[in-house]
Amino acid sequence: MSRLFITFLLLMACPTGSQAEALSREKIDGWLQHLGASDKFDASKGIDWGVMPGPFYTPELGLGIGTAVVGMYRPDPQDTTSQNSTLTLSGYASSTGAFGLSVKNYAFFDNDLWRVFVEGSMANTPTYYWGQGFHAGDKDNEKEKYTAQVLTLRPTIYRQLIDNVYLGAGWSLAAQNADEMDHDDLPKIESTPQGPSVFSSGASIDINWDDRDFVPNPRRGQYANFRYTHYAPGLGSDTRFDEFQLHYSHYHALSEKSVLAWEADGAFTQGDVPWSMMPLLGSDERMRGYYQGRYRDKNVVSSQLEYRRQLTWRHGIVAWVGAGTMGPSLSSLNNGRWLPTGGVGYRFEFKPRVNIRLDYGIGKGSSGFYFQVGEAF
């Protein structure tokens, strides 16, 4: 993240002297309200929108501009049982030619009897491919440079069975093309069975327990989820494979302003799994601090513990520790090699209980900044 953006955050968090007079919280609130960043939700607007732009810098993407658009709404204003629905759009463009757009929608209907969750993304990003497994990821001098052209979409409809228990049915689409490959590097992607272009399409079924008080930023509750996705040529996929996802997270309010959050997550695949669909050990949600895509394999397990503290006004901070491992089979997960992760982050409450987050994650021999909307988990 750029020094300009960090300086801006520090000025807001710690104004002194004439700065405090010139940049009073009331004035900043006034500026933010022009962007829709009110600290109160106005259901009469239909969708209560807010926009937050910000510069960033990373070694991979260079200098760029990111924008987060957050909308809060209630499909039925008379529904007092369901939590507020949220629609989040995040986009970026950088000096390296990278650009991307992602969307997340959490919608709650009929006194929380029905839920519709949609996640999607499109991106054109210069990146690297190391290969499968720890052995490949450790060979940094043998990675292949390419531009990832990615399109993903995962809609899911949930129906409540009993209190806090939901059954879901959905679809998963993922298209990835490796473009502009550096021919001076080893031809790793070209050597995969699927080649540079992969299309995966599959049907999924979920069952979960969810009593979180607010999905984008829980203060209390638990979330346990099992998802099975079957990809097959008959469903439009290039290859046939299965994906199993297990997740558990727990949120405990230590006080009115502090929360302890913990999660364990596993992604397990079998069959003819394409290189683009192998689970990753490293992202903006889990194992922060590792280059996304460096470590990938058929099976990945990780866990993290995060302390979240609300400060004065809109400010907050977090700190986390965690670890993860991976392997080509379930039995290989017990090989004893685990990668650590830890870091700290800043939170700015853009909409009621919807944070803009700036995280700095540290891994073994690597680190990274993350600028996103909503908590990591």
Residue ranges, per PLM feature:
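C-terminal outer-membrane beta-barrel translocator/porin domains of Gram-negative envelope proteins
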Residues: 23-24, 192-196, 203-311
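Short loop/turn motifs that connect adjacent beta-strands in outer-membrane beta-barrel proteins
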Residues: 21-23, 37-47, 61, 75-84, ...
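Gram-negative/organellar outer-membrane beta-barrel architecture
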Residues: 41-50, 56-195, 355, 363-377
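Cleavable N-terminal export/targeting peptides
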Residues: 1-37
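Transmembrane beta-barrel architecture of outer-membrane proteins
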Residues: 48-50, 64, 98-100, 148-152, ...
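Solvent-exposed loop/turn segments connecting transmembrane beta-strands
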Residues: 55-66, 91-101, 111, 197-198, ...
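Membrane-embedded beta-strand positions of outer-membrane beta-barrel proteins
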Residues: 51-53, 87-91, 116-120, 167-169, ...
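Outer-membrane beta-barrel "beta-signal"
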Residues: 204-207, 344-350, 366-377
